[in-house]
């Protein structure tokens, strides 16, 4: 059975496209949702730390965390569903993983592609607008610092910048 193409019904308000990731983007989406239904969130998939990094490595899928956060921000669901998406396990082998990330990982496992999994989760959550991964390729962030050092991996870049107190000269996406 071929999955139907994801179409956003005509919505009210100005058309807004946002690009980013992390807590900042999801917080902005919560605010934008109050003013327009025409939101396209283009979300980073370069995270390599925490639970997203583990799912990325173990399951060979794009990191789900930033995508999940954006869908959670745009969701039109019952409060218990928001609570579930945000829930983090505290014990055992799932400690640190969020239910929302695992839910998206499970959808990825039963879908033909990560894009299809994102569309399915968007439908389940009845999100306002749409959430799109910035790329479907497996990519890493690479940063070149003023001192000449080059670091690969979002989590390592943050750590190196904090430890070295050195400014980043250039950032680029590289295929993994």
Where do the PLM segments sit?
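Non-transmembrane, aqueous-exposed alpha-helical and coiled segments at domain scale
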Residues: 1-16, 30-33, 37, 41, ...
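Glycine-rich oxoanion-binding loops at beta->alpha junctions
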Residues: 3, 169-176
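Electropositive, gly/pro-rich neighborhoods at or near active sites that engage anionic ligands
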Residues: 46-172
């Amino acid at each position: 059975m071929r999955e139907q193409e994801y179409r956003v019904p005509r919505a009210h308000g100005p058309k807004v496209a946002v690009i980013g990731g992390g807590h900042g983007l999801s917080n902005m989406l919560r605010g934008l949702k109050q003013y327009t239904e025409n939101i396209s969130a283009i979300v980073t998939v370069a995270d390599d730390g925490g639970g997203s990094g583990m799912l990325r490595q173990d399951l060979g899928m794009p990191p789900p965390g930033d995508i999940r956060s954006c869908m959670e921000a745009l969701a039109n669901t019952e409060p218990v569903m928001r609570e579930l998406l945000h829930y983090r396990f505290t014990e055992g082998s799932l400690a640190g993983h969020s239910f929302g990330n695992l839910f998206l990982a499970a959808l990825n496992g039963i879908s033909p592609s990560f894009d299809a999994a994102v569309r399915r989760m968007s439908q389940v959550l009845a999100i306002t607008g749409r959430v799109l991964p910035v790329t479907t390729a497996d990519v890493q962030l690479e940063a070149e610092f003023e001192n000449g050092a080059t670091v690969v991996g979002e989590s390592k870049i943050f750590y190196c910048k904090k430890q070295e107190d050195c400014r980043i000269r250039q950032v680029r996406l590289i295929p993994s």
